[in-house]
């Protein structure tokens, strides 16, 4: 007997998943870059965002440009595909060795450590919320 129901085949996208010990350290507030054997430390002078909660939990985004865009627009550097995210939601800006998140007029706002922010200089371990995505910021060693 055939299992054909007339429904089209569904393609599934996958992302990398972190070790359970690393996720526990991130949730407890410990610096993810200090995890023993951690492979999530970004290169010197760069930063990284790790999706802690959201449809693509575990995905990593390297912040190695002066400006990195995040939003629902397919041309965003960090593409977050969900209706709770504005097309052009936020920018991550690197300047003078530090990183800042700037809300660029989103509908639902950008949060840092669960507080609404128009802009905020980030520290390693900060949690940035864009729509229903929660991303942990990890800062690489100083260049």
From Swiss-Prot:
GO annotations of cellular component type: cytoplasm
SUPFAM superfamilies in UniProt: SMAD/FHA domain (SSF49879)
Region (Disordered): 29-50
Protein name: Oxoglutarate dehydrogenase inhibitor
Keyword set, alphabetical order: Cytoplasm, Phosphoprotein
A Pfam family reported for this protein in Swiss-Prot or TrEMBL: FHA
Protein source organism: Corynebacterium diphtheriae (strain ATCC 700971 / NCTC 13129 / Biotype gravis)
Gene: odhI
Residue ranges with Low complexity bias: 29-38
